[in-house]
Amino acid sequence: SSTVRIHIHTNSPEQIFELVRQHGEIQQRKVEDMVHQHQEWIRSEKDRVGIVTDSTCDLPQEFLDRYNIRVIPLTLAMDKDEFVDKVTITPEEFNQRLSFSSSVRTSQPSPGAFQDAFAAALNEHDGLVSIHLSAAMSGTWQGAVAASRNSADRIRVLNSKLVSIGLGMVVLEAAKRAQKGATIDEVEEAARAAASRTRFYVGLDTLDYAVRGGRVSKGSGLL
């Protein structure tokens, strides 16, 4: 067997990973966001408070770029393959694989992923408000809290008690306030207020995928 190290600059990392998977096993992967690195040089002085969230927020990329929102991706495990959510697999590809994958799991970002994201964001901003999906659904919020302890005076971590576009609306409200020059206290309060008045309803055509992901028991899935 042989090992190959590949270094590529691309706007479509998920396509590169899919191509490489066709020729062998990926032992280690690393993806860096060059857009955010460039934005360090052009950010507004008003942008004192940065917004961080996770990849479940489901905001369109246009809004993430416009408001300089930093996203920490979760990991998706589909059968024997692992993907970095919305980085090495797109939502469209996820949906395609979902139809034939027998096992689908998500896992929270690693402690190192949180620490790296917070360190990079603190180079751009005086403080951060980090807003995440419901702590009842994932350990992501707890991971963010743990990673923020060494910079607790500069990082506020919020459990939105929401997910998907519900979380996205809270993140967007906080980002708008931050871009207007609000203080970290004001941005945090805006996020908490938005979360408290947001209600998120979901209708499912089938419980099959919820059962596969472990969110619903097999017994409940039969009802």
Region annotations inferred by a language model:
Residues V52-A113:
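N-terminal glycine-rich anion-binding loop in soluble enzyme alpha/beta folds
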Residues S99-G143, E188, A195:
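Glycine-rich phosphate- or other oxyanion-binding loops that anchor nucleotides, phosphorylated ligands
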Residues S1-T3, Q37-Q39, S44-R48, T56-R66, ...:
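Mixed-charge interfacial surface used for oligomerization/domain docking
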Residues V49-D54, I131:
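Short, hydrophobic/glycine-enriched beta-strand segments
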Residues R5-H7, G127-S134, R156-N159, E173:
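Short glycine-rich or small-residue beta-strand-to-loop segments that form or flank ligand, phosphate
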Residues Q22-E25, D47, N123-D126, S151-D153:
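Short glycine/proline-enriched coil/turn segments at helix->beta-strand junctions
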Residues S1-I42:
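Gly/His-enriched, cation/cofactor- and phosphate-binding structural elements
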